[in-house]
Amino acid sequence: MEFVKDLKTPEDYINNELKYGAHNYDPIPVVLKRAKGVFVYDVNDKRYYDFLSAYSSVNQGHCHPDILNAMINQAKNLTICSRAFFSVSLGICERYLTNLLGYDKVLMMNTGAEANETAYKLCRKWGYEVKKIPENMAKIVVCKNNFSGRTLGCISASTTNKCTSNFGPFAPQFSKVPYNDLEALEEELKDPNVCGFIVEPVQGEAGVIVPSDNYLPGVYNLCKKYNVLFVADEVQTGLGRTGKLLCVHHYNVKPDVVLLGKALSGGHYPISAVLANDSVMLVIKPGEHGSTYGGNPLAASICVESLNVLINEKLCENADKLGGPFLEGLKKELKDSKIIRDIRGKGLLCAIEFKNELVNVLDICLKLKENGLITRDVHDKTIRLTPPLCITKEQLDECTEIIVKTVKFFDEKF
């Protein structure tokens, strides 16, 4: 392209993006050009371990050849036809997803935010038509410090100032309770107008907050007791990230509704899904909800192959096998660190929380980049450690060395 011939250096690309793009993100100053497996490469061909994985979108690894081939083959035949017509691919995808996860129905969308918006509508509709809540009185309970997206509905359910400041007025009837607090939850669920409780099995954007072992079983029991839909937002935790196909499987509970996204496409295409049984899903009738791109043939074919890769390559098992030793290794090597507050995680959804009164966490991210590993901070105090699930023990050991070396560099200042 003639008009981009002036773009040669990383600074050129960064300045070009800052000049022509909206400033709704604040990226780490690295310009990525290509990726494969657990690695990404910048415009100078420097290689980095990817420890953000596009917020757990590339669980299967970057540019997986099987997913890529499925994408190309489907694109040669039919990419989109809208839901005005049936397609070969969609029904196959729906059958695969529902059989795999044990639900009657799935509603396909594009993004995690759309999956959550779908859940809001589904809970309300069920509340009015099944639970018989009075008109316009349905209430949804969520957890403080949750993250579900940045649409108006999602930020109405949020307590994060950066997402909510100067964007009001918000959608009504969202009640916020502390995460991992069954007593506070029960007080809210006693309200007969509550139709749903939406919860992340592990709070990702909050800094990888892992609940106590009795929390999700307690949530399940309380929702049954008060006739409230239990909705698990597995957009980030699902599809192997925590060592199980769904994070809720660690706790042997089955939510009424499950939300999926991100790794549903292996990072190749925006795909999300909402799963529920007929008694819940069929309250939505034709024309009441949908998306032009939701469930398109291209997305459906990519989704099927992404799930095939996850299962055939035993990526859930790999995350389960490597996650514990990875965390324990970090804790052992960094037990004397003066700047670390906590090291925590589940499977390969891990994080280090730093004492941000002592150290600038963004500086740690920049030093990690310099040492060959990229990730991003959360709320100026926590660094996420979420590699693709195809990572090997040898690669993870090398990454542990990079992380330990980087932390000790900052520790030496104290």
From Swiss-Prot:
Listed EC numbers: 2.6.1.13
Subcellular location(s) per record: Cytoplasm
Catalytic reaction annotation: a 2-oxocarboxylate + L-ornithine = L-glutamate 5-semialdehyde + an L-alpha-amino acid; L-ornithine + 2-oxoglutarate = L-glutamate 5-semialdehyde + L-glutamate
Disulfide cysteine pairs (residue numbers): 154-163
Pfam family membership, one: Aminotran_3
Keywords associated with the record: Aminotransferase, Cytoplasm, Disulfide bond, Pyridoxal phosphate, Transferase
Alphabetical list of SUPFAM superfamilies matching this protein: PLP-dependent transferases
BP GO terms, sorted: arginine catabolic process to glutamate; arginine catabolic process to proline via ornithine; L-proline biosynthetic process
One Gene Ontology CC term in the entry: cytoplasm
One GO molecular-function entry: ornithine aminotransferase activity
Metabolic or biological pathway, per its Swiss-Prot or TrEMBL entry: Amino-acid biosynthesis; L-proline biosynthesis; L-glutamate 5-semialdehyde from L-ornithine: step 1/1
Reported function: Catalyzes the transamination of alpha-ketoglutarate with ornithine or N-acetylornithine and of glutamate-5-semialdehyde with glutamate and alanine.
Family that this chain belongs to: Belongs to the class-III pyridoxal-phosphate-dependent aminotransferase family.
This protein's name: Ornithine aminotransferase
Upper taxonomic lineage: Eukaryota, Sar, Alveolata, Apicomplexa, Aconoidasida
Gene behind this protein: OAT
